[in-house]
């Protein structure tokens, strides 16, 4: 209990007590000039102010305190209860009640902006009003006369008298709603109180007690150990006065008076630093700043200027640069910006929303990163589990945690390793992503998700140019790796994993999160294969609450894996959660057949085929149960409105699993050859359990009734029919006259396939290919759709991997596993070195072309200033890239250097994080080049 003592005349000392926090007020004190034989009665203070001028506020302190008779066994004294005492010895921090008594205004504040700020009175009932009780009047006539005389004398002296208040203490009489002391704001100012609790120097700034002097009391400085604060308003005013004692001149009268006009403005100390507000602090400060609506506060710079650091005029005192976000004086700063400001530059344990807020500053376009540069060794982040412990606000690789070899997986933009915390010994998976290719959606979308079908996130830390994303380690690897090991999966196990993936998608879609890249490589399995969980949110998207989707296809970014793309994605139409349903059914075809959909029938850019061809339901194995085939067809409807939702499809998959007898196949069985494509068109018709469902998107019927089917596209020819083309062996080795839209992969891996690469007629074939695409575009689509699909064609096309070329028995097993994307793509293909070096901008080169979704990112500035954005295979060499773009460079001889002009070796492999180069001239008479490309041929200086 905090107590302030006032000694009485004729007493040797004063009773033992504690002192309440006192605040500054106005100017001088006025003594009370009458002796009393016993204690001062509180009733005498009600009508007659003891203190005037600067210390007039002490009248309110005394009148709102609790007076008791101190004559029991000791010298008489007045004990004023300043603050309630907490039973558990918890330190009290100054806060506000809902109705604040305004000094000098004779009223309580009715501001609604402070209605959420609790009053930490110990063990009070939350939301209830304190009971008002008054004692009966027992005053004699003599005492009334004395009060009347004293009031008249003070009125003649020009001193305003305070309105009489209840005789009972504030805790008993004030009708102020209070809260339990367990309020989350109970220790709001405890973190910053240390910088305000130093004793103030100077006679006008300290706290006062009073001693007898002649007929009245004079103020003296108290003992320093009794110093405490009263409220945030008063303590902040103390600090400002301490730093700016000269700023005591008259202040202009504001247009909109501050409600607490009876006391100095609470936040005039703008230049004080360092003070980094925490999240809860900023919430309270926002309330205080907006206490008078959105109007500016009077006096010195108000709170918004303090937080925003945008004062219109300099204040006295040393200038200290504000570290808070800079905003306009009248603009409110979101709490999230204060939170991010507090998190930057350190690694701490926190919540998911803190990590999501901090991750937004890691994007490549962040102003802070552009200012600091990508190679800074800053270490900042948020860890979401206690098993990963930062040390001294840092969490660095090889210092606080270490990785284990070999790596778990690799994608287009990063690698996945097993890691171990050196302090706790906890092991999990870590994704190492370059800052240039990091997408903030990876963390924003999955932070805070708690579903067994979603790989949990353990935190993320930025260390220099790398972002390390920690997540649960599932020992079973990826579903794509399992398909690689088993060839193809049994129907029951494929249904089992599809059902779990749909359960995870249902969880995401109810939270308006679009995964964007559902495929077998992004489904991780437990060590026994009983649990499947979705990972890799690098292409995730938060959908709008109104349900209106947006196009995922942009000029420099295409989400997902090409073979799993929905038609609305490749055509640039608005997308919603139905995109994931299409991709999940494509993953189902991958599990049943052992290869990606579309790849058995078409070669080249698949975007056109996905947009123009019917859904790939003909790839459903004929051995599938009817309910299984029906479930796949429900998810492969071309029109999203007719496509099943995640919940609907999950129920259908569950019924199909029951139809086949449940999960009975072993977790890892014998290798089974992938299913070959149908041999003829008749077989294809027989494999469709419900043929009327295969309709083009423009003719989809809303009631689901069967409609006449259009002619099916040409089917791939049988391998035995290839010699029927009447081509000589020499011609067949020169180029392939087969229609590119129906090329069977088996025909592409014959003995003449390697010889085809070095022939000139391939250029004519490339031209015919483009003309064929243009002709097919002119029929079913509008002009806008044609332009969108043509933009996809300018990217690049698929190619057979070297593994399928070297091992024809596993050609269909190759299944384009390099078609990976995102931050965390578990590449299930063996790391065979590819010999392809062509790009989307070098179609004239007769070699295989890597997928846009797999290759590393290469950016080259041409001689005329144009930028070429290229996707290449992993481990491709710089010299091969230069040779591939030679037809696009307007120079006879050129070489490649870095952006700052440093030379690079022609045999240097492009890192997974990508590379940024520029062209430079390499004439014969120059000695600046060590290698060059001249007339399309690589030359090395001897």
UniProtKB/Swiss-Prot annotation:
Q: Which positions does UniProt annotate for ATP binding?
A: 408-416, 431
Record-linked PROSITE patterns: PROTEIN_KINASE_ATP, PROTEIN_KINASE_DOM, PROTEIN_KINASE_ST
Specify residue ranges for compositional bias: Basic residues: 136-152
Q: What segments bear the compositional bias annotation Polar residues? A: 809-823
GO biological process terms, alphabetically, are: cellular response to mechanical stimulus; defense response to virus; immune response; non-canonical NF-kappaB signal transduction
Q: What is its subcellular localisation? A: Cytoplasm
Q: How is this protein organized at the quaternary level?
A: Interacts with TRAF2, TRAF3, TRAF5, TRAF6, IKKA and NF-kappa-B2/P100. Interacts with PELI3. Interacts with NIBP; the interaction is direct. Interacts with ARRB1 and ARRB2. Interacts with GRB10. Interacts with ZFP91. Interacts with NLRP12; this interaction promotes proteasomal degradation of MAP3K14. Directly interacts with DDX3X. Interacts (via C-terminus and kinase domain) with PPPC3A (via N-terminus) and PPP3CB.
Please report which protein family the annotation says this sequence is part of: Belongs to the protein kinase superfamily. STE Ser/Thr protein kinase family. MAP kinase kinase kinase subfamily.
Summarizing the function annotation, the protein's role is: Lymphotoxin beta-activated kinase which seems to be exclusively involved in the activation of NF-kappa-B and its transcriptional activity. Phosphorylates CHUK/IKKA. Promotes proteolytic processing of NFKB2/P100, which leads to activation of NF-kappa-B via the non-canonical pathway. Has an essential role in the non-canonical NF-kappa-B signalining that regulates genes encoding molecules involved in B-cell survival, lymphoid organogenesis, and immune response. Could act in a receptor-selective manner.
Q: What is this protein called?
A: Mitogen-activated protein kinase kinase kinase 14
* Organism from which the protein derives: Mus musculus (Mouse)
